[in-house]
Swiss-Prot record:
It comes from Koribacter versatilis (strain Ellin345). Keywords: ATP-binding, Coiled coil, Cytoplasm, DNA-binding, Nucleotide-binding. Residues 637-757 form the SMC hinge domain. It is found in: Cytoplasm. Residues 115-181 are annotated as: Disordered. GO terms for molecular function: ATP binding; ATP hydrolysis activity; DNA binding. GO terms for cellular component: chromosome; cytoplasm. The keyword DNA-binding applies. Contains large globular domains required for ATP hydrolysis at each terminus and a third globular domain forming a flexible SMC hinge near the middle of the molecule. These domains are separated by coiled-coil structures. Pfam families: SMC_hinge, SMC_N. It comes from the Bacteria. Gene3D superfamilies: 1.10.287.1490, 1.20.1060.20, 3.30.70.1620, P-loop containing nucleotide triphosphate hydrolases. One of its GO terms (biological process) is chromosome segregation. This is Chromosome partition protein Smc.
Amino acid sequence: MLKLKKLQLLGFKSFCDRTELKFPGDGIAAIVGPNGCGKSNIADAISWVLGEQSAKSLRGIHMQDVIFAGTRDRKPTGMAEVSLTLIDPEQYEGKIVEPEIEIRDEMPDDWDEAAAREASMEEVDEYTAEVQPGTNTEAEATEQQAAPSEGAAPTTEATAPSTENEAAPSEVAEGQPSDAQAAVINPNAVVLKIRRRKFNTNRFKKGEICVTRRLFRSGDSEYLLNGKLSRLRDVHDIFMGTGLGPESYAIIEQGRIGQILSSKPTDRRAIIEEAAGITKYKTKKRLAEARLEDAKSNLARVNDIFDEVTRQMNSLKRQAAKAERYAKLRDEMREKLRVVLASKFALIDAEIAGLEAELTTVTEEIATRTDAVQQMDNEHGERVQRGYAIDAEAKQNRESLNNVSREMDRAAQRRRTNEERCAELVARSAGAEAEIQNTTEQLGRLEEELATNRQVLESAAADVAVAQSDLQTKQQEASAAAANLMNVEREQEQRRSQIFQAVNAASNVRNRITQAEERIANLDREHGRVTGELSSATLQLESFGGQRGQLGLEFESANTRVNALSSEITDARGSLQQKRQEEIEAKRHVDTLRAEYATLLGKKGSLESVINEHGYSTESVKRLFQSGGLREGNTPAGVLADFLEVEDKYEHVVEDFLRDELNYVVVKSWGAADEGLRLLKGDVDGRATFLVHPSDSQAKFSFVLDESMRLPFTPDRVTPMKNCIRVLNGFGKSLEVVLPKLGNGYIVPDPAIGRELALENPDAFFLSQSGECFHNVTVTGGKQRSQGPLSLKRELRDVMRCIDDVERSLRDGEARVLMLGKEIAELTSLLQRLEDEKREGEKQAMTSGHTLRQLENEMARVRDRHATYERELQRVSNEKSERENAIGGLRMELEAAEARHQELEAAMNAATQSLDELRTARDNASHAASEARAQAAALEERHRAAASSLQRIESMVQEVSARIGKLKGQVESAAAEKQQRESENETIAEQLVTWTAEREAAEARDRELQTESEQVRARIAEIEEELKTARQALDAARDRRGELHASVARLQSDGEHMAETCVQELSVTRPDLMAIEELPRLTGDELAVADTEQKDMRTKLENMGPVNMMALEEYKETAQRHEFLETQRKDLLDSIENTQNTIKEIDQITKVKFDEAFAAINENFGKAFKKLFGGGQGFMKLTDELNSSDSGIDVIASPPGKKLQNVLLLSGGEKTLTAFSLLVGIFQYAPSPFCILDEVDAPLDETNVARFNELVKEMSMQTQFILITHSKRTMATAPVMYGVTMQEPGVSKIVSVRFGEEAARATA
C-alpha cells in the first residue's frame, strides 16, 4: 500500500513561501497550532491537489481564492502550487524516514527578517515566471511534438462551479477540454510552453508518485504526475478506489464528520461505493452512456442522410434509364446520318465532276477567241508603244528641268546661310575674348583668398590644443569633488540605518492596524466582487431569458424557412424545365442559321474568286494581273470597273454601253503604263488599255473638264448617264474627258424617244432600259449579257450584307443558347443550393431545439448561484462592521510610535546641511568641466570649417583655369569656320551660271514632245474601235464560264456545310467517313427515305426533353454512398448494442461488489460502534432493499440505554463517535494510504477522546493518520508533531518535531 511521504506548498492560501512537510512512513502525525494559523489549509491543500473542484469545499467562493492574496508586507503571489509525494515501501529505493529539522533556540546576530522576506518573495516570483504557461518557440514546439505525453492544454478554473452541487465531472474538468472546445481550439495555435521545472523527472525514484497541481491568477491550471503534464482524469484514475478519489472518505475536513450522518442517503452510498472500488465502474458506465447517447444521435443523423440518399438514388435511377434510352436512340440516329451524309457526298462529287468537264470545254473556246483578240491587241500595242516612248522622254526631260531648278534654289539658299553664319562668328569671337579677360582677373583674387585661409587653419589648430589641456585639468577637479561627496554620503547612510532600527519599534503597531485595514479593504473588495458576481448572475439570467426567446424565434424561423425553401425548390424545378425546352429550340434555330451561313460563304467565295481573278475582263487583262510583273510602284490600282458604282436599275444598260471601257487598267503613273505595255509585248500576249490616275502630275492636265463641250440642254424625259454613276477614288467629273461616251450618254424611258433624239443630236448616245443604243443613224441591240463586273460587285455587296445579317442573327442565336445554358446552370446551382439550404435548415431546427433545452437547464443552475451570492453578501457586511470597531484602539498606539519616529528624523535633517554643501561643490566642478568641454568642441568645429573653406577655394581655382582654356579654343575654331564659308560662296556663284543655260534647253525640248504625243493618241483611238466586236463574242463565253464556276461553288459550299455537320454530329471528318467502304451509297427515293428517318429520330431525341447524361455516373456514385451509409448504420447499431451490453455487465459487477462491501462494512461498523460506546447498536440499512443498485443508505445508531429513531437526535459527541465508527468500518474493509482528520475530536470529552485515540492507534498499523487537533491527549499519541505558526501576520510557517527517539531514550 502507498504511504504519504511529503507535502510541498507554495502560494497556497496562507503558505506564501515554499513549505515542505515530511511525514514518516507509518503511524500518526499531529498538526497543531492556534486558531487562524492555517492548520486546516494543509488538509485543504491535500484535497485540492487530489482534484477537488468545488471552491466551497475549500472554504472559498472562487477557485482563485486559494492563491495567496498578500499582506501589508507581502504582495500577492501569481500562482498556487501543491505537490503530494507518495511511495510504495516494497519498491521504493530511497530513504523512507527523512532526517529531522534542526531547531535552534537563538537567532544569529546578522539575521534580517525583512531581507529574508524579500528574498523569499523574489524566489517565489522567479519560480512563478518560470512555470507560467505561454507560447512556445519553434525549438520548444519540436520538443513538445517529440514528447506528446509530456504536454497538455492549459485549463481555466475561473469558471469552475462554486458549489458542491455544481462540481464538474472529471471527464470534462480541468486539463481535459470538452468536445465543443476541442472543435474550436486549434491544437497548433497555442500550446503550453515546455519549460524547465524545479521538479525534474530525473529526481523521482522507483516506487515514488508525485502529484502536483498549479493554479495561476490568469485562470490557467495544470496537473503534473512525476513532473509530466497530465489531465485531471489521470489523477482521478490513479487514486480511484483507494478512498482518495472524488468521493473521498480518507479526508475528513473540519465539520464534515457530522455531515456523514446528516447528508442524504445517496451521498452516504457514494462513500460505500468508493470503499467497494466500484467508482471506476461508475465512471466507465457514465462514459459508456455518453458514448451511447452520441451513437444514438449519430444514428439519427445517419438515418436522415440515408433516407435522403435513398430518395436521391431512386430519382437518379429513373434519370439513368432515360439516359440509356436517349443514348441508344442517338446512336441509331448517328448511324443513319452517316449513311445519308456519305450518299450525299457521293452525289455532290459526281455532279461537280460533270460541271468541271463542261467548264473545261468552255475554257478551250475562250482560249480560241482570246487568240483572235490577241492579234488585234498586238497591233494596238505597237501603236501605243510609240506613245509611251514619247511620254517617257517628256517625263525624263521634265525631271531634268525640275532638278536644275531645285539645285539653283538650294545654291542660293546656301550662299545666304554662309553670309549670316560669318557675321555670327565675328560677334561670338568678340564676346569670348572679353570673358577671357574677366576670368583671368577672378583667378587672381581666388589665389589671394587661398593664402589667407591657410593662415586661419594653422591658427585654429593651435587654439584646439590649448583648449584640450584646460579641459583635462577641470575634469580632474570634478572627479575629486565627487569622491569627497561619496565619502560623506556613506556616513549619512549609516545614520539612516540607525533611524530604520528606530522605525522597526513602531512597525509592529502599524502592522496590526494595516492588517485590520487590509482585512476591511479585502472585505470591501470581496463585497464588490460578490456584488459584481451577483449582478453578473442577474445579467446572465436576463441574458438567458433573451437568448431563450431568441432561440425560440430561431427554431420557429428555421421551420418557416424549411417550408419556404420547399416552395422555392418546386418553382425552380419548373423554371429549369422551361429553360431547357427553350434551349432546344434555340439550338435548332442556330443550326438553320449555320446552314444558311455556309451557303452564303460559298457564294461569296465564288464571287470573290471571279472578281479577284478578273473573270469578266479580257484574257489579256487577266493574264496581265496573273503574271505579277507589275510590282512595287508600278502595281495597277485595278480596272475602271473598280472605280464605278451604278444604280441597280441601270446596271445592265451601263455594262453593255461601256463594255470595253470598264476593262481599262488603271495605273498610278505613266511609268506603270509603260511597264504594262512592255509585259504585253514580251511575257504576256495580248493587248490592253491603260488609264493613268489623275494623281499623276502629267496626267492631271488631261482630266480638266471642258464645259463648252456639253449639250446646250437636257430634256426632262432624258437622264444623263453621268448622273447614274458614282465615281470613286479621285476621278470625279474629270473622267468625262477620258471617256467622251460617258459625258455624251443619256438614258431614255423607251426606244422611240431615243431614236428621235439621236437624229436631233448626232454626237450623243441614247440608251433605252431594254438594251438598245441609238447614235446618229445607228442602233445597237440584242440579248443582254448575263453578268458584268458591275452586277457581280453589286451581287457581292448584297451577299456581304446577307452574310452580315446572318452573322448577326447567328451571334444572337449563339448568345441566346449560351445565355440559356448559363441560366440553366444557374437554375441547377440554385436548385442544388436550395436543397442544401433546406437540409441545413432542418439541421438548424434540430440544433435550435437541443440548444433551447440546454439553455433552460443552465438557467436553473444560475438561479442557484444567485441565491448563494446573496447569502455571502450578508456575511461580508457583518464581518466588516466588527473590523471597523477594532481599528479605533489601534490608532492611538500608532500615534505614540510615530512621535518617536519624528524625533529621530529631526536629528537626521541636522546632519544633512554639510552634505548639501559638498553636493554644491561637486556640481560647480562639474559645471566648469562642462564649459571647458563645450569651448574645446567649438574650437574643433572652427578648425573643421577652416579646412572645408580651404578645400572649396582650391576647387574654384581649378574650375576658373579650365574655363579660360575652353574660351581660347572657341575663338580659334570660329576664325577657321569663317574662312571656310567665304570660300564656299565663291564656288556657288560659278555653278549658278552653268545651271541657267541647262534649264533653257530643257524647256524647248518639252514643247516639241507635247506636239508629237497628241498625234499618236489620235491613232490609238481608231484601232480600239476595231477590237470592240471581237471582244463581245469573247465576253459571252466568259459569262457561261462564270455560271459554271458559281454552280461548282454552290455545290462545294453545300459539301462544306455537310462536312461541318459531319464533324459536329458524328465527330468524324468527311475523308474519314468516305473511307468507310461498308457504308451503302443510296440514291433517289432510298436516300430521301433514309434522310426522313434520321430527321424523325432527331425529332424524337428533341422531344425527350432535357436528359441528364451524367445520371449514370451519378447513380453509381450515389449507390456506392448508399452502400457506405448502410454499412455505417449497421456499425452504429452494433456499437449501440455492444455499449448497452457493457452497461449491463457493469451494473452486474457493481451490484455484486456493493452488496459484498455493504455487508462487510456494516458488520465492521457495528463492532466499532460497540467499542467506542461501550455497548449499544449501530448498523446501516438500504432505503429500498428491493432495488439495491440505486438505493440510498440510512444509518441507525442506538447508544447504550437509548432508543432513538433518528441519528440527528444524537448529541454532537455521539454523532462524531457514530460517524467515526462508520469510518473505522470502511477502513477495516478498504484501508486508504492515509487518513486526515481535521479537529474531529473537538466535540468529544476526555473519556471519548481516549477511546478515539485508542482506536486510531490500532488503525495506524495499516493506515497513516494525520490529525489536526487542539487536544493534548491526541497530541500525546503522535510521535511526530508539526507546529503551524503565524509569526508574520497572514503568513503560515511550519516547525516539525519527532518525539519517538527522545521517548525511547528516556525509557531506557
